[in-house]
């Protein structure tokens, strides 16, 4: 493609000039939400965990939703011999405070936009109501042995493309209710905003 970086040095130079990755996530989220009939507005200040305010008219009545956008890089298991490479095609992680979304508001949603290291955007996004996301955080393993932060490992299953959040940081041999939470109902489910 004309104008695309050709060498690893050119790719690195482009990455160094690129804006903050969160901006990429918010821009992708705005486009996706606009395609779903919402009018997205950016907040000048990131207050109350809100990056984007959505507005639309339904039956001549305005509706509003608040979105916290999380952009996360997806990594493909680098070695086919790794245990996770047998189960997952891509993995992203997010570290959360245990009570990060404890203050529930029915209008608040958490949207994950994923990108690969080459800046290609994953076609799937995850959209969680804040209460559901808080409950998932509570079930997730500790980030470190001490402290209240939780480690959320979001992974796309190799077999069927369904999304899961791992319940353990230890090796497991199959995807089941003990090893993972199936969160595929939140993948590209824009109707959760209704």
Language-model features, listed with the residues they occupy:
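Mixed-charge (Asp/Glu-Lys/Arg
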Residues: 1-48, 53-194
């Amino acid at each position: 493609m004309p104008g695309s970086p050709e060498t690893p040095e050119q790719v690195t130079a482009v990455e160094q000039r690129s804006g903050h990755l969160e901006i990429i996530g918010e821009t992708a989220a705005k486009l996706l939400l606009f395609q779903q009939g919402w009018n997205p507005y950016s907040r000048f200040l990131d207050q109350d965990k809100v990056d984007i305010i959505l507005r639309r008219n339904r039956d001549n009545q305005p509706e509003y939703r608040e979105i916290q956008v999380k952009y996360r890089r997806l990594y493909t298991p680098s070695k086919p011999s790794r245990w996770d490479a047998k189960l997952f095609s891509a993995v992203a992680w997010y570290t959360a405070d245990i009570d990060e979304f404890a203050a529930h508001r029915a209008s608040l949603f958490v949207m994950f936009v994923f990108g690969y290291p080459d800046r290609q955007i994953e076609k799937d996004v995850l959209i969680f109501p804040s209460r559901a996301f808080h409950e998932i955080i509570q079930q997730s393993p500790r980030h470190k042995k001490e402290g209240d932060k939780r480690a959320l490992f979001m992974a796309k299953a190799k077999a069927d493309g369904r999304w899961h959040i791992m319940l353990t940081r230890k090796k497991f041999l199959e995807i089941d209710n003990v090893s993972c939470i199936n969160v595929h109902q939140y993948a590209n489910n824009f109707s959760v905003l209704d």
